Regions:
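Short, small-hydrophobic-rich alpha-helical interface motif
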Residues: 1, 19, 23, 34-45, ...
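Short amphipathic alpha-helical boundary/capping segments
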Residues: 1, 10, 99-108
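Arg/Lys-rich amphipathic alpha helix in sigma70-family domain 2
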Residues: 47-54, 63-84, 93, 156
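DNA-recognition helix of helix-turn-helix
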Residues: 67, 71, 132-158
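A short pre-motif secondary-structure segment
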Residues: 114-118
C-alpha cells in the first residue's frame, strides 16, 4: 500500500460517518440513496481534490461535494420524470405524533439542505453559502422558510389560526 492510499483510508474513515449522516438527512432517510451519494462524493472528491483551496475545513468541502452530487442527481431525476405524472405527496402522519424526521424530509430540497446544515450540523450562514454557491441572504431566508414550514407541520392547529 502506498502513502497516498494510507492517507485516503485515514480521510475516508474520519469523514465517511459524518457524510453518511448528512446524506441520510438530505435524502429523508433513504439508506441506499445515502450510501450511493457518499460513494459518489468520494469518487468526485478524489477527482477534484485539486480544487480544494484550504479556505474551509476539508469536511466542509466534502459536504459541499456531497450536496452538489445530490443536486445533480435530483436534476437528472426530474428530467426523467413525465411532468403530468407528478403529484405532490403528503408526508405520512399518524394520529399520535408527527415524526420530526418525516417533517424534515418533506421540506423542499433547498430549505431542507440549509435547515440540516445550519440547525442540525451547526454550520454558519457564511459556510452554507459557500457550500451551496448562494449568497448568505438566501441561506437565511431559506432557513426561515424551513422553520416556518416545520412549525406548520408540527403544530397544524396553530397554523390554522
Amino acid at each position: 500500500m502506498t502513502g497516498g492510499e494510507d492517507a485516503f483510508r485515514t480521510l475516508y474513515r474520519a469523514h465517511t460517518p459524518a457524510l453518511y449522516a448528512l446524506a441520510l438527512r438530505l435524502t429523508g432517510g433513504d439508506q441506499h440513496e445515502a450510501e450511493d451519494l457518499v460513494q459518489e462524493t468520494w469518487v468526485r472528491a478524489t477527482r477534484k481534490i485539486s480544487s480544494f483551496r484550504g479556505e474551509s475545513a476539508l469536511r466542509t468541502w466534502l459536504c459541499s461535494v456531497l450536496i452538489n452530487v445530490r443536486r445533480e442527481r435530483t436534476r437528472s431525476a426530474w428530467r426523467m420524470v413525465d411532468a403530468p405524472d407528478i403529484e405532490p405527496a403528503a408526508p405520512p402522519r399518524d394520529d399520535s405524533a408527527f415524526d420530526l424526521e418525516r417533517a424534515i424530509a418533506a421540506l423542499p430540497d433547498g430549505a431542507r439542505d440549509i435547515f440540516v446544515l445550519h440547525d442540525v450540523y451547526g454550520y454558519v450562514h457564511r459556510e452554507i453559502a459557500e457550500m451551496l454557491g448562494v449568497v448568505e441572504g438566501t441561506s437565511k431566508s431559506q432557513l426561515a422558510r424551513a422553520r416556518s414550514l416545520l412549525r406548520r407541520a408540527l403544530n397544524p392547529d396553530e397554523a390554522r389560526s
